[in-house]
Amino acid sequence: MPTTLELELAQAFRHGCQDALGEDLVEVRMDGSRARGDARPDSDLDLLVLTRRNCAELRERVHEVAASVSLGRGWPFTLMPQSMTCEHFEGLLRGERLYAQDIQREGIII
């Protein structure tokens, strides 16, 4: 289970994504070791951003939000966002990709 600080950072990131992406944002999920609660002090914070459209501009905005949120507040760990469309994520699930299955099972919707 993530800590309060990790959840606060993830929520700040989601709010930033909502402002930057608008209706293109579908969902943000925290995944990886911080979502599972077994992170080391130097672990990053993995976040999956699901969008309606696939374009470089949206991916760039997601990374700009991550940089702004993590640097602007002096958080003790790095944000590592991954963005993809819902359609792509569903395809990974259908293809039984472990990455997608882990996120589906362990990811926390923010």
Describe these PLM feature segments.
Residues 1-29, 35-41, 51-110:
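Catalytic core of pol beta-like nucleotidyltransferases
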Residues 45-49:
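Short beta-strand->loop micro-motif that forms the acidic, two-metal-ion catalytic signature
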